[in-house]
A protein has these predicted regions:
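Hydrophobic beta-strand segments that make up the repeating blades of beta-propeller
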Residues: 39-42, 87-90, 138-141, 188-192, ...
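Short, conserved, GDST-rich strand-edge loop motifs in beta-rich repeat architectures
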Residues: 193-203
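Blade-level signature of beta-propeller repeat domains, shared across WD40, Kelch, NHL, RCC1
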Residues: 239-249, 253-281
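Blade-edge motifs of beta-propeller repeat domains
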Residues: 4-21, 53-69, 101-120, 152-170, ...
Length: 281
């Protein structure tokens, strides 16, 4: 992994650090509470997580976590409410989320494993407070299940509810959340990637969908049917990948920024109707 240090807006080469096989995701958190930003690297090829400790800009391997099959992503949060930053790891081939708790010094131990729907092949994992009850929740994009799964945080910290599965369109691959309709509950944007197949061709394409919250029942958010939107105005080959929600033009409305890797472009969708917020009120 290559490190680039920023000095007054100019980046310089700070060397290379060896990590696991096929690193696919990188996250920056302070896992040892020394105010320096450390690094978490997800290695898909050897089912591991590399923990890189930051000592005043110099990184060294702190530990390697052995995790489930085909890890794709981590998200961080204080799952057990002890003021230390913990990890959730998405193991796609196992259809599970692993919860790893931090002792405050950067030592992680696996506390629980949350199963998702069998054969759903989740591709993305995000965290947030979906029902705005003060507990951090999790959500996965279930690529083969054509659904998203919501895992609601509990007062015990490392445990989550059984998944609430919401059926949506084909091939959900990535997620983002915000309160678009200002109702005090979190909504979702989903990037769909799928093949359009005819007798003569098979084309990787896609679109995006928006799920708006409608109510809460027994602690779970009830959502309206998914609204599907084209990712761009181009007619072919536009499967979106990552999603960023921000007020890009400072008009107090939430906009969408989508990466389109096949087209080597970014798409910007102006949020003309959404004056919501990025987090719970």
């Amino acid at each position: 992994m290559k490190l680039l240090l920023n000095s007054s807006g100019s980046f310089s080469d700070n060397g290379t650090i060896s990590v696991g096989d096929i690193p696919v995701h990188l996250e920056s958190i302070d896992f040892d509470n020394d105010t320096d930003s450390d690094l978490i690297v997800v290695n898909r090829g050897d089912n591991s997580i590399s923990l890189l400790r930051n000592d005043s800009g110099s990184f060294s391997e702190n530990a390697t976590l052995s995790v489930g099959n085909t890890p794709l992503k981590t998200v961080s949060g204080d799952w057990d409410n002890d003021s230390n930053t913990d990890l959730a790891v998405l193991a796609s081939a196992d259809n599970t989320i692993e919860i790893w708790l931090n002792d405050g010094s950067g030592n992680f131990s696996k506390a629980s494993t949350q199963p998702s729907s069998s054969g759903s092949s989740p591709r993305d994992l995000i965290s947030g407070d979906w029902n705005c009850d003060g507990y951090l929740d999790l959500a996965t994009a279930d690529y083969l299940g054509n659904s998203i799964s919501l895992f609601y945080g509990q007062s015990s910290g490392a445990d989550f509810s059984s998944p609430q599965t919401i059926s949506i369109g084909k091939g959900p691959a990535s997620l983002a959340s915000a309160d678009f309709n200002n109702d005090g509950r979190m909504d979702f944007v989903i990037a769909h990637r799928f093949y359009y197949t005819t007798s003569s061709l098979s084309l990787l394409t896609g679109d995006i969908g928006i799920l708006l919250s409608e109510s809460v029942s027994n602690g779970q958010v009830v959502y309206t049917s998914e609204t599907r939107l084209a990712a761009t105005t181009e007619s072919q080959g536009t499967p979106p990948a990552d999603i960023l929600i921000q007020d890009l033009d400072q008009d107090s409305k939430l906009d969408l920024l989508l990466s389109l890797p096949i087209n080597q472009k970014l798409a910007v969708l102006s949020g003309k109707n959404y004056t919501g917020s990025l987090n719970c009120p």
